[in-house]
Amino acid sequence: MQQQKPLEGAQLVIMTIALSLATFMQVLDSTIANVAIPTIAGNLGSSLSQGTWVITSFGVANAISIPLTGWLAKRVGEVKLFLWSTIAFAIASWACGVSSSLNMLIFFRVIQGIVAGPLIPLSQSLLLNNYPPAKRSIALALWSMTVIVAPICGPILGGYISDNYHWGWIFFINVPIGVAVVLMTLQTLRGRETRTERRRIDAVGLALLVIGIGSLQIMLDRGKELDWFSSQEIIILTVVAVVAICFLIVWELTDDNPIVDLSLFKSRNFTIGCLCISLAYMLYFGAIVLLPQLLQEVYGYTATWAGLASAPVGIIPVILSPIIGRFAHKLDMRRLVTFSFIMYAVCFYWRAYTFEPGMDFGASAWPQFIQGFAVACFFMPLTTITLSGLPPERLAAASSLSNFTRTLAGSIGTSITTTMWTNRESMHHAQLTESVNPFNPNAQAMYSQLEGLGMTQQQASGWIAQQITNQGLIISANEIFWMSAGIFLVLLGLVWFAKPPFGAGGGGGGAH
């Protein structure tokens, strides 16, 4: 990295807005389409299962391209790569919006996923490298807010657009944001390019990465639909992923110019930070996916209202993050993360105790609001720990690798959560159904009560079956909340293996 004077004043503010908007745009796009899949599939004359490839295609392409960011940044420069990625993302978004067939949409979602990969790691790296060292914690805090708020806004915005406008606007909204990001970046970072190196292309590493991570991501996305290892396709994808990733690790550790710099894991703080942020994000993101589905399927919420019930989690971080960033240099990051994990556990236990049939909007919204304290003390401190002790020229590679592990953990968390939810519901459904028989006086009393309300026996059976399904879904969700709370308490000990001092992005030690 060329040693340049950090930005100041208005230039610093404009750059912060530009990089935060780019992060917001990319994270938003990974969740905004989820609730609109039925609308998109119906409009393009496809089945719902075919429509899910709109999500899968983006996730696979994005998972492959994120780890490449460090190598690409060394090759072409961080500023240039960031600008071209933003421009390409805006163009691909427009192309997604005008797609007239599902195949066309999936093709442009792949392009969108590929060019989106560098946006988050580079926004993080450029932010840290152009901020005054004393203010880097504030920069990370502001950046973290966008990562927190965007996944919450996605389902709300996606639901509102698909309910009221053409689904194409889900993608069109990226175009003006992309243009604004490019203009602001040119104004502030032109002439501040990072040093480049003419490195040969690690073709073997690239091929293994594409095959291994691509197979793994498709397996995670398609597993639940295909009933996991009952499907030959899932078994083949798993074998291919395991073999390719094992070869990738061996190859990258022995190659002179690796496309993924695994030597970063020699840093104790990088390894501990990646582990903590990935495992915690796995639980956090799994709940982000589970909660709206539970509210829609059991409690009859619309997509928009389910999103609004999840939204309060973003309120506290918006208020607290700048304050935490301001005083971060006086705080032990491990204490903040410990507080965060305790609050996560408290909120998951809270849900497990209070989620029941007939609960109101507040029963869902209040735990989300309080969980905001956990989220505010999560991303920024763990990112600071992860990047501490690394020289500026390794920040892009470190940021891309840590964001890759976090993104992959989110996919794994989603798959595990939704699969457990479905499987446990089936088990509870079978157990609850056993009690509905002619020999159970409570069951017969319920039938009599329903028939007294004018239902036929068939209608009463259907109503009871639906209630059993709802009970099973609630019980299985509560079991997941119990398990998540327990794992957060176990994670408390892991963060204390990190070694201070924790300077944000290059400042401070960090054990090697």
UniProtKB/Swiss-Prot annotation:
Please list the residue ranges that the record places on the Cytoplasmic side of the membrane.
1-12, 73-81, 129-136, 190-202, 250-271, 330-335, 388-407, 505-512
Which keywords describe this protein according to UniProt? Antibiotic resistance, Cell inner membrane, Cell membrane, Membrane, Transmembrane, Transmembrane helix, Transport
Which is one GO molecular function term here?
transmembrane transporter activity
- What cellular component terms from Gene Ontology apply here? efflux pump complex; periplasmic side of plasma membrane; plasma membrane
Q: Where in the cell is it found?
A: Cell inner membrane
Question: Where would you find the membrane-spanning parts of this chain?
Answer: 13-38, 52-72, 82-100, 110-128, 137-159, 165-189, 203-223, 234-249, 272-295, 306-329, 336-355, 364-387, 408-428, 482-504
Q: What is its main location?
A: membrane
- Which Gene3D superfamilies does the record cross-reference, listed alphabetically? MFS general substrate transporter like domains, Multidrug resistance protein D
**Which CDD domains did the record assign?**
MFS_LmrB_MDR_like (cd17503)
**Membrane topology category:** Multi-pass membrane protein
Q: Which Pfam families match?
A: MFS_1
Q: Name one GO biological process term.
A: transmembrane transport
Q: Does the keyword Membrane apply?
A: yes
Tell me the InterPro entries matching this sequence: EmrB-like, MFS, MFS_dom, MFS_trans_sf
Q: Which residues lie on this side of the membrane: Extracellular?
A: 39-51, 101-109, 160-164, 224-233, 296-305, 356-363, 429-481
Superkingdom, according to UniProt? Bacteria
Give the protein's biological function: Part of the tripartite efflux system EmrAB-TolC, which confers resistance to antibiotics such as CCCP, FCCP, 2,4-dinitrophenol and nalidixic acid.
Which protein family is it in?
Answer: Belongs to the major facilitator superfamily. EmrB family.
**Oligomer status and interactors:** Part of the tripartite efflux system EmrAB-TolC, which is composed of an inner membrane transporter, EmrB, a periplasmic membrane fusion protein, EmrA, and an outer membrane component, TolC. The complex forms a large protein conduit and can translocate molecules across both the inner and outer membranes. Interacts with EmrA. EmrAB complex forms a dimer in vitro.
Kindly provide the name given to this protein in its UniProt entry: Multidrug export protein EmrB
Organism, scientific name: Escherichia coli (strain K12)
